[in-house]
Amino acid sequence: MSRYRGPRFKKIRRLGALPGLTSKRPRAGSDPRNQSRSGKKSQYRIRLEEKQKLRFHYGLTERQLLKYVRIAGKAKGSTGQVLLQLLEMRLDNTLFRLGMALTIPQARQLVNHGHILVNGRIVDIPSYRCKPRDIITVKDEQNSRTLVQNLLDSSTPEELPNHLTLHTFQYEGLVNQIIDRKCVGLKINELLVVEYYSRQT
C-alpha cells in the first residue's frame, strides 16, 4: 500500500488531530472518535483507527509500519513504546519536531532534496534513525537556509521535547537522548496498534 497523498482534512475528521500530516485540526465537537454511524464501534475498528492514526501521522506505508512493529517486537522493553521511539527518532520526524518543517511530508522533502546534513554529511534518507549526540544542520547554501528560515518563521512556536535542542541562528539541531514516551507528539494508544498487528498473524 502506498503512502497517503489524498485530502488531509478528510483524515483528521475521521481520526482526530494528526499534527505530522497537517497543522489543521477538526472543529470542536466534531471529534469522529466519539461518533459512529452504526452506534458503538467494534474493538477491531478501534484498533484499526489507532493504527491508521500512527500511519498517517508519520507518513508511512503499511509495509513500513509493519516493519517497524516487527523490529519493536524483537527489542527489549514494551513493544508499543519501542515502536513510538523508532518512529519519533526518524530524521523526517526529528526535523518536524525541531520546527524546521511544518509537517512531516515537508520535512521528508527537505531530506530527499539534500538540504539536511547529519554530523556534517548529507543524509537523503528520511527514515534515517537519529541517535543521541547526532548534530542535524541545514546545508550551508543560501537556497537551503532561506527555505528552512521561511519554515521556521511560519511555524507556531512550541516547547521542544526534552530530547532535542535547537540553535536557530546556526540552523542546527542536537539530539540529546532517545525520546521519552511522555514527549511523543501524537495522542495515541500504542498498545492497540500492537494488538491490531498481533491479531493479523
Swiss-Prot record:
Residue ranges of the TM segments: none
Region described as Disordered: 1-44
Signal peptide residues on this chain, from the entry's feature table: none
GO molecular function, one term: structural constituent of ribosome
PROSITE patterns: RIBOSOMAL_S4, S4
Pfam families referenced in this protein's UniProt entry, alphabetically: Ribosomal_S4, S4
Gene3D superfamilies: Ribosomal Protein S4 Delta 41, Chain A, domain 1, RNA-binding S4 domain
Residue ranges of every copy of the S4 RNA-binding domain listed in the record: 89-152
Annotated compartments: Plastid, Chloroplast
GO BP: ribosomal small subunit biogenesis; translation
Keyword Ribosomal protein found: yes
Record has Ribosomal protein as a keyword: yes
Positions with biased composition (Basic residues): 1-14
Subunit structure: Part of the 30S ribosomal subunit. Contacts protein S5. The interaction surface between S4 and S5 is involved in control of translational fidelity.
Similarity annotation: Belongs to the universal ribosomal protein uS4 family.
Protein name from the UniProt record: Small ribosomal subunit protein uS4c
Species of provenance: Draba nemorosa (Woodland whitlowgrass)
Top-level taxonomy: Eukaryota, Viridiplantae, Streptophyta, Embryophyta, Tracheophyta
Gene that this sequence comes from: rps4
